[in-house]
Curated annotation (Swiss-Prot):
Binding positions for Zn(2+) per the UniProt entry: 1086, 1089, 1098, 1101
Organism for this UniProt entry: Drosophila melanogaster
Lineage: Eukaryota, Metazoa, Ecdysozoa, Arthropoda, Hexapoda
InterPro entries on file: DNA-dir_RNA_pol_su2 (IPR015712), DNA-dir_RNAP_su2_dom (IPR007120), DNA-dir_RNAP_su2_hyb_sf (IPR037033), RNA_pol_bsu_CS (IPR007121), RNA_pol_bsu_protrusion (IPR007644), RNA_pol_Rpb2_2 (IPR007642), RNA_pol_Rpb2_2_sf (IPR037034), RNA_pol_Rpb2_3 (IPR007645)
Enzyme class: transferase
Name of this chain's protein: DNA-directed RNA polymerase III subunit RPC2
A single Gene Ontology CC term: RNA polymerase III complex
GO biological process, one term: tRNA transcription by RNA polymerase III
MF term (GO), any: DNA-directed RNA polymerase activity
Location within or outside the cell: Nucleus
Assigned protein family: Belongs to the RNA polymerase beta chain family.
EC code(s) of this entry: 2.7.7.6
Zinc finger (C4-type): 1084-1099
Amino acid sequence: MVELKMGDHNVEATTWDPGDSKDWSVPIKPLTEKWKLVPAFLQVKGLVKQHIDSFNHFINVDIKKIVKANELVTSGADPLFYLKYLDVRVGKPDIDDGFNITKATTPHECRLRDTTYSAPITVDIEYTRGTQRIKRNNLLIGRMPLMLRCSNCALTGKSEFELSKLNECPLDPGGYFVVRGQEKVILIQEQLSWNKMLTEDFNGVVQCQVTSSTHEKKSRTLVLSKHGKYYLKHNSMTDDIPIVVIFKALGVVSDQEIQSLIGIDSKSQNRFGASLIDAYNLKVFTQQRALEYMGSKLVVKRFQSATTKTPSEEARELLLTTILAHVPVDNFNLQMKAIYVSMMVRRVMAAELDKTLFDDRDYYGNKRLELAGSLLSMMFEDLFKRMNWELKTIADKNIPKVKAAQFDVVKHMRAAQITAGLESAISSGNWTIKRFKMERAGVTQVLSRLSYISALGMMTRVNSQFEKTRKVSGPRSLQPSQWGMLCPSDTPEGEACGLVKNLALMTHITTEVEERPVMIVAFNAGVEDIREVSGNPINNPNVFLVFINGNVLGLTLNHKHLVRNLRYMRRKGRMGSYVSVHTSYTQRCIYIHTDGGRLCRPYVIVENRRPLVKQHHLDELNRGIRKFDDFLLDGLIEYLDVNEENDSFIAWNEDQIEDRTTHLEIEPFTLLGVCAGLVPYPHHNQSPRNTYQCAMGKQAMGMIGYNQKNRIDSLMYNLVYPHAPMVKSKTIELTNFDKLPAGQNATVAVMSYSGYDIEDALILNKASIDRGYGRCLVYKNSKCTVKRYANQTFDRIMGPMKDALTNKVIFKHDVLDTDGIVAPGEQVQNKQIMINKEMPAVTSMNPLQGQSAQVPYTAVPISYKGPEPSYIERVMVSANAEEDFLIKILLRQTRIPEIGDKFSSRHGQKGVTGLIVEQEDMPFNDFGICPDMIMNPHGFPSRMTVGKTLELLGGKAGLLEGKFHYGTAFGGSKVEDIQAELERHGFNYVGKDFFYSGITGTPLEAYIYSGPVYYQKLKHMVQDKMHARARGPKAVLTRQPTQGRSREGGLRLGEMERDCLISYGASMLIMERLMISSDAFEVDVCRTCGRMAYCSWCHFCQSSANVSKISMPYACKLLFQELTSMNVVPKMILENY
């Protein structure tokens, strides 16, 4: 019994002694308040913490490793010269304020001043100057953009009061960068796992591929089967190399040894025989001959290196460094690579015999997620190597020159290079790393600040590297392996459907941990080193191979014992808590993973049919004595990744625990992500409705943070009076949505009222709107810089201009202050000027001698454009990083709901306002309550949003009881309890009320279902979309009306509309639309030759006798002229009608 206490995961071992003292028939008492573990988890991990953990790992650990790996710079010109990096540090955020003054800065200041929130990267170096050896400390080599809330950030460890002093919202999650004043997020990137064998059928060819990835190299190696023979394929070789040649090149020369690595059973011998004969036919018998054969198949390099190597040396170099780059080679011993290749061959053989052994690319255990830390470390490594290479070339060039001063390498270290590289990568989102041939676009995006939830939802977004245009269902479909790791509802509709995903609530993404300690534990637990055994035991059916991060570690005879011991050590805290151990019985392998980018989540451990977390542990958590990490250290909870979940039996709740159960889910609602967690009773809705709400919840306006009044964003929507929802969910409280809500509780009557509510349109009560329902503020900004130029001229801002006759300020300049900038509080109309800026006509000439007063200036004013007037909220004058004056103006508009504005409930039920009715005409119930909104009942049956009806009931009961009801997923308040509460307060238990018509005053014939529902006002407002045109600007080239609302464009009558008019035979209408109202043009045509004439003169006929005037569209005339220029001459034949 003692050994079983160690947390056994195996089904066979869980047989119990019938004389055991415990009685299994006694049901397990459910733990109360087990969900309190979720907020405890979210304090330390989850949501945005993975971005921050990853970045912290980079600036504290990875950056030191990168500098250590490239610590020495030497020069071929002078053997005594060297530059050695001793240490590297990332400092605290600061900003250069000119005159060599640097001061500490805050993210808010960087947002306002359009600068980058970054910290200096400093190094300690030792180098030689001539014959001296010099040490320098704290030398700046560049600036690192800092992630908000990382370990070096100014906000870390501050209390709410201190954060408010820094103008920062305490609920802001952090995890993004501020680059040139813009908030940028590095999205989580989904990749196929590295260093892992994947067997697949590629156009009928069975192949096993490995993508090796180390710090130095990335390469892809394939073993494939063609015509009954096996080959190895790699990009650096022109042709597939027979596998036996590879074995011989790797030093396994005898055919018997090769066969014993593959397997000595008759099946393996029969399948592998043809490959052995193939090598015999090629006359390859020795390692040297194999290397020469490989050398003849190498791809010719474009740049020949200075030291020319023979083809066989090139081939050996390739085998050592590039093919299977992740398999370690000690001292030119290639045995491990030979063993690895033999395993790949065996995988291909097995898959040929049994088609079920193909690996699934879309299985989520085969994926890794790249976070900001790993992407930035690749970028930094590339820039750092480039800087060192440049220093080396400068040294090579300058040391041989005879100079008065000796060569000093410090003078050539340019900090701007690394700074600009990191900044431009984050601000443009283009990650280009030449060494890995990596070119990615769209890695970063601007943080969406429509609402608090849209910002949070963006931090948990996972971006796939798959092309969006291909209509493939595999990568898009919901995989069973994504259970609990990714949100099943939160994905966009359209082309990105299923490719852009979101993390679930309790998902954690691992960061890399050192594998050395785990290897020592594994060897102590009974793993034998594979290098010390021959090929035969490897193929023994009782022997299991042990892999660590894709590399072969060794083999074991007692795999259950090994797995049990490793898990026991992990639970006792002797090993990292994110190390995963899982068994694959089909491949006879045990995989240990310590790498970063795996998805995992915490589970309660179950032993002997009892969860290890007891009620007294939860009470300690409640009292604040116990933290989430204590549960991990005491071995009560552990993290499982996608692969290890396959080895476990996980119960949904306490009732489902059986004999073989190994783990218990902490809380079912953590299956959903942030956006889907806002929906009350999502398990009562049809699935796509929850998906629609996830998309619309991000467009709902509300509050974006406590500091929203101090921000100057390019576009910001604020709801004037947001409510916390009456029906909450646990996720709403965990994500602080109730503190920064986006919506209002509207009293809704579900009934038909006039014809203005068909197709989901809503009818609003005018009195409610007058009291402030759905009212919002829209903030926009305008900005300009005032620069000084190289020729000593500069921009200037002029005061307002006066009319010469009346001596009054002209209308355009009416809102300007005397300094030429608009004053706060003014109302600005369309085309009025806000900043009266002028710019010198010449900025790039030589400095002007004594004539700076006569420089001609051109006016480049910043004016207001918009159909409705705005108010100036604030004007800010500052300076940005380039020492230019920066002026920002914040404009405010108050929008009142009008017909055509879009609203939606939290169940994917969207609709526009169809009619606004006076309160006198609205129906009212016998308590005198008048609804804010009337919704058509036809929105319910086909949509099956039962969650909405439950929300209405719960909200109504909550109002009467004075409490919030919970509509948490897979739980929440029970309908029976809600109905009992309604009955207790004298209301009908099904939520229907007795209503009177507001128009006639008589009772309505049916009872009306009514109560409060949480409605969101969406950003789509009719004022921003409404567009019509009678006359306006035309395009220069075609003389047709311009296109688009912003350019006052026309509405195009397209090909389909034209076809429709042709089918009606409305020829005069076609002519009026397509020519007269668009681009009619009179042109002269010669009746003799059919060409166009000019001024009644035909140039071709040299005559004006037969020239007529006709009308045609200008675009048609242009087409004829363009064709003529290409030697295609259209001729027009004219007839009289």
